[in-house]
Regions:
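Fibrous stalk/shaft segments of extracellular and virion attachment machinery
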Residues: 1-25, 219
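Carbohydrate-recognition beta-sandwich/jelly-roll modules
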Residues: 33-55, 111-117, 156-178
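Glycine-rich, flexible loop motifs
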Residues: 21-83, 92-93
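Short, surface-exposed terminal/edge motifs of secreted or surface/virion proteins that either
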Residues: 15-17, 93-111
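N-terminal accessory interaction module
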Residues: 90-91, 122
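Residues within well-ordered beta-strands of beta-sheet-rich folds
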Residues: 86-90, 185-187
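Extracellular receptor-binding modules and their adjoining Ser/Thr/Gly/Asp/Asn-rich linkers
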Residues: 104-150
């Protein structure tokens, strides 16, 4: 440890020099809320104003209320269902230029930028979203709670409670997860093999069903390797609320038809 700053009015002590470089070492992210990014529409995010963010030790920015859309993608022109996206703030290193926001599928840094001039500040999952009211109760097309046809009132979009930031996120990797409440995050999809003896929540994968000779303990062990745990019954009921029951004669709501001869894929 050593003293980083001193009060020296003569400015002869280098430790009294307060510049962008030094400020970047002591300013991480200062935000009015841990949830400084949120889903403000099916295909848009909002970065709240008043955040102070350091990028690469050479740039510090104060955010304005900013809307991000697919136009901020580093590649492509639309979000894809089942994908996890990362939000970056980037610094062109031009003093007169403001920050630039880039959304990318890359988990390290966006295309066209690098680790020194970009910083990951959050992310989200783009998937299937059920129509709900402010209390998260399912609605049908006419906005009636559990009204006729509510089961099919689903559309593609940014999963609102999947949006995470550096101050609001699970302890494990946040991909394929949503916020349940009370500090708890849960997986969106049935767990599948992550290839590293753990489990993951990912769209379009073959789920682990128990037919792989895995028992309860195996699931506990493999989830622990991924930094997760099994939900308790109350948590399961909370995040399963609003999911329609599977049908015996169709796979409309889930892979549940009695005529199925094998397992499907997640999503």
């Amino acid at each position: 440890m050593s003293r980083l700053l001193v009060d020296d009015v003569t400015k002869t002590d280098a430790r009294a020099l307060l510049n962008v470089n030094k400020m970047a070492t002591i300013s991480d992210i200062v935000a009015p809320s841990n949830e400084y990014i949120y889903a403000s529409g099916a295909n848009e995010l909002t970065v709240v104003e008043g955040c102070v963010i350091a990028v690469g030790g050479a740039g510090i920015f104060k955010t304005a209320n900013t809307i991000l859309t697919a136009a901020n993608l580093d590649a492509g022109s639309a979000f894809a269902v089942g994908k996890d996206y990362y939000v970056y703030i980037c610094d062109s290193r031009i003093d007169s230029a403001d920050e630039k926001y880039v959304i990318s599928l890359n988990s390290t840094y966006p295309t066209g930028w690098n680790a020194t001039n970009s910083r990951k500040i959050g992310g989200f999952h783009y998937g299937r979203c059920r129509k709900v009211d402010s209390n998260l109760q399912p609605l049908n097309g006419s906005s009636v709670i559990f009204g006729t046809g509510w089961e099919s009132a689903v559309s593609n979009g940014i999963v609102p409670r999947s949006v995470w930031t550096l101050g609001h996120r699970p302890k494990c990797s946040p991909e394929g997860m949503v916020y349940l409440g009370g500090g708890t995050w849960v997986d969106i999809y049935l767990n599948s093999d992550d290839g590293a003896k753990g489990l993951k929540s990912e769209y379009g994968c073959a789920p682990m069903t128990g037919t792989e000779s895995m028992n309860w303990y195996n699931f506990v062990e493999r989830l622990a390797k991924s930094g997760k745990r099994l939900p308790n019954y109350a948590e399961f009921c909370a995040y399963a609320f609003g999911s329609p029951a599977g049908l015996d004669n169709a796979n409309t709501n889930a892979w549940s038809a009695t005529s199925n001869t094998g397992s499907g894929v997640t999503g």
